[in-house]
Amino acid sequence: MSKMCLINVIIVLSLSSCATYQPNQVDDICKIFHGETDWYEDAQAANKRWGTPIGLMMAIIKQESTFRHDVKPPRPTFLFIPLPRRSSAYGYAQAQNPAWQDYQKATGNWSHDRDDF
């Protein structure tokens, strides 16, 4: 019995460590930054590098993705059959493939993902 409990605890802990932060109150940036302190540090670094106000960056991310890392545009349907998406936008910023490739080329950050904050 104790081995089974230990296995269940290990499974739950390993699965919970894979989860990404999803704020439940997207209208309060202070609570979002309090829940995920790395986001504030990243926002400060972006502010320093690009000169964009933190509030503006967070407002754009809220509008584009509601702070969901894996959001994509909806798929159109034809008679209940899902069709291809009309846009390649993906992630927090909803950057399309050409814009994301331009960003990677300009910054040299080939390992960055659109779904990473």
Where do the model's predicted regions map?
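Bacterial N-terminal signal peptides
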Residues: 7-16
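Bacterial N-terminal signal peptides that target proteins for export
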Residues: 1-7
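Catalytic glycan-binding domains that act on GlcNAc-containing polysaccharides
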Residues: 19-117
